[in-house]
From Swiss-Prot:
Compartments reported by the entry: Cytoplasm
The EC number(s) this enzyme carries: 5.3.3.2
Annotated keywords: Cytoplasm, Flavoprotein, FMN, Isomerase, Isoprene biosynthesis, Magnesium, Metal-binding, NADP
Chief localisation class: cytoplasm
Residues annotated to bind substrate: R8, K9, S99, Q100, R101, Q166
GO cellular component, as recorded: cytoplasm
InterPro entries hit by this protein: Aldolase_TIM, FMN-dep_DH, IPdP_isomerase
Name of protein: Isopentenyl-diphosphate delta-isomerase
Function: Involved in the biosynthesis of isoprenoids. Catalyzes the 1,3-allylic rearrangement of the homoallylic substrate isopentenyl (IPP) to its allylic isomer, dimethylallyl diphosphate (DMAPP).
Name of encoding gene: fni
Entry GO MF terms: FMN binding; isopentenyl-diphosphate delta-isomerase activity; magnesium ion binding; NADPH binding; oxidoreductase activity
Assembly, per entry: Homooctamer. Dimer of tetramers.
Record family assignment: Belongs to the IPP isomerase type 2 family.
């Protein structure tokens, strides 16, 4: 099982780097419209992109979300995480790591997650999977594993990733999700670190968001449909014909990022990381205007990170930041707080969905609360 976990990490990285693993559908932000302001009444140079999130101040509202880990020192996951960490250190943005299950099963892989020597100041988020906390898990994790995952790598927070879609498709998937909320309640009430509930490409509904808020999580990474599809990744991994067919059918399963963001913002008071198909700064600005505290990216920086290209990662993120800044100038927003107050027009499929699921006018007011 332990060697299988490490092999799976290699395969996930390989397919994300070499195959088209993105959803065939959009993340929904084409239906979200910001209103151009011909007289912004601000100077572009005065725009401030800094944000506060989970008690820390960051220079940009962009987080590198968890991707990988679990290979040995000197191997690809080690190189990816160290490259991303150096970029995050330079930019003063938070960094998430990939699942640390491999580290728990094979402790010698811990160095592929350890980046403090190159990123002493980065807000670092560890990562464990929800099914390992299910009451029927083969080796059920407890608070002890959570603290080990955080403290061994000197992280500042922990993400518990919710990936039922991926697990249901994966040949060796764990679908033991009963009892996870109970486990989350114990974790949040016991540890002194922020806990982020993180989806993995299929989005979070308002109902699940309310449950997560009730058990005390500190933030939600909605990771909606429209970016990397983990059903697609598993499609390329499996050799089993039935599993491949299942993966193909569920390639585009989930809640679009824009929809998930609106639902979670309307239903809870939690900080939100909006990830899932964030491929340009205009989309990111829309997400921030819709009430996200941060936006999250992963796949766009994976390729330069795999090459050890720190400057390449920095260049991509600074490009996104400049695009966000330009949007803010064109809508007359001096800072992210003001961006959340600019007019929004929501049309098309996203509007139709939200009219059935939430009070749209109430939501448009609720986005001011963070």
């Amino acid at each position: 099982m332990e060697e299988q976990t490490i092999l799976r990490k290699f395969e996930h990285i390989k397919h994300c780097l070499t195959k088209n693993v993105e959803a065939h559908v959009t993340n929904g932000f084409e239906d979200v419209h910001l209103i151009h302001k011909s007289l912004p009444e601000i100077d572009k140079d005065e725009i401030d992109l800094s944000v506060k999130f989970l008690g820390r101040k960051f220079d940009y509202p962009i987080m590198i979300t968890g991707m990988t880990g679990g290979t040995r020192k000197g191997e690809i996951a080690w190189r990816i995480n160290r490259t991303l960490a150096q970029a995050a250190q330079e930019l003063n943005i938070p960094l998430g790591l990939g699942s640390q299950r491999a580290m728990i099963e094979k402790p010698e892989t811990w160095e592929s997650y350890y980046v403090r020597d190159v990123a002493p100041d980065v807000f670092l988020v560890g990562n464990l999977g929800a099914p390992q906390f299910g009451r029927n898990a083969k080796k059920r994790y407890s608070v002890d594993e959570v603290l080990y995952a955080i403290e061994k790598i000197e992280a500042d927070a922990i993400a518990i990733h919710m990936n039922p879609l991926q697990e249901s498709i994966q040949p060796e998937g764990d679908t033991t999700f009963s009892g996870v909320l109970e486990a989350l309640a114990e974790i949040t009430s016991t540890i002194d670190y922020p806990v982020i509930a993180k989806e993995t490409g299929a989005g979070v509904s308002k109902e699940v968001a309310v449950e997560l808020e009730a058990v005390g999580v500190d933030a939600i990474d909605i990771s909606g449909l429209g970016g990397t599809s983990w059903s697609a990744v598993e499609y390329y991994r499996t050799k089993d014909g039935e599993k491949r067919n299942l993966a193909l059918k569920f390639w585009d399963w989930g809640i679009k990022t824009a929809i998930s963001l609106a639902e979670v913002r309307w239903a809870t008071n939690l900080p939100i990381i909006a990830s899932g198909g964030m491929r340009d700064g205009i989309t990111m600005a829309k997400a921030l205007a819709m009430g996200a505290s941060m936006v999250g990216i992963a796949l766009p920086v994976l390729r330069p990170a795999a090459k050890g290209d720190v400057e390449g990662v920095i260049r991509i993120i600074k490009g996104y930041a400049e695009e966000i800044r330009n949007v803010m100038f064109l809508v007359g927003a001096r800072n992210i707080k003001e961006l959340r107050k600019v007019p929004l027009v929501i049309t098309g499929f996203v509007r139709e969905w939200l009219l059935q699921r939430i009070d749209l006018n109430s939501y448009l007011r609720a986005r001011f609360k963070m």
